[in-house]
Amino acid sequence: MSSPKRQSPISIDPYAQNGFGVRFEWGTNGAAAISAGASAMIVVDVLSFTTTLSVAVDAGIEVFPFRVRDATAATFAATRGAMLAVGRREAADTGVSLSPLSVRRAVADGTLKSSSKLVLPSPNGATVARQLAENGVPVIGASLRNASACANWAVRAVRGPIGVVAAGEWWPGESLRPSVEDLWGAGLIIDALAAAGAGPMSPKAAAARAAFRGVGRNLAMGLAACASGLELANDGYGDEIAVAAEVNVSRKVPLLTGESFKAA
């Protein structure tokens, strides 16, 4: 019996999701893989960077994403005339941190105004956004709060493939931990992109959409029960989860222009 003939090899990047109008991947490496040829990239970090970003942009605040919270971030903030978000414990009840509630409090008490600038460090969503911006692709910061607004804006504003990147979290040792809250957020955005006419979806994008549809009405419960939600609750910040679960309450689209996010 003769052995099967080997098919002629094809020349295609198996990771780029070329040929699909809606793409989906994880983290910085995934963002790099699917951004080539994309007309826009949407970054999702539900707990908490893009949720906090949406709260800030709703209030008219200009937000500078930054990779780490260290001396370089402080210098960067000073040269931009911006406030630097600090750690949650350092912020306590009065400072501004990565917590969306801290931004709401600061807006309510006048610490942050519509003319304010805020440097918001995050090893996840901010890092992905800055990397993509350095590559010259338009970047949108989306969460559950503004998923439909971001998707609709992207479909209207660009012609070509749209990539959605779930930022994910990190395991000890610096390896990516895919986080289900970002999968759900990406899935909602992909669902909204499809409803607005974008497509076709890559298999990975379709899987993310199915994950969001699968959680359905149990989304808020799922956010509280997932690993990232439990981490926040264990540290005493479980009340932030309700802000992340405010589905499609915002019509503002955070667009990264140069170094900072502003409402599109």
Enumerate the predicted regions with their spans:
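Active/ligand-binding-proximal structured segments within catalytic/core domains
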Residues: 40-52
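Catalytic cores of nucleophile-dependent amide-cleaving enzymes
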Residues: 133, 143-172
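Short beta-strand segments
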Residues: 43-44, 85-87, 120-122, 142, ...
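Residues that scaffold, gate, or flank divalent-cation-dependent active/transport sites
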Residues: 23-35, 49-64, 70-118, 125-126, ...
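Short glycine- and acidic-rich boundary segments immediately preceding or forming the N-terminal edge
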Residues: 1-22
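Extracytoplasmic/secreted cell-surface and envelope-processing proteins
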Residues: 51, 172-175
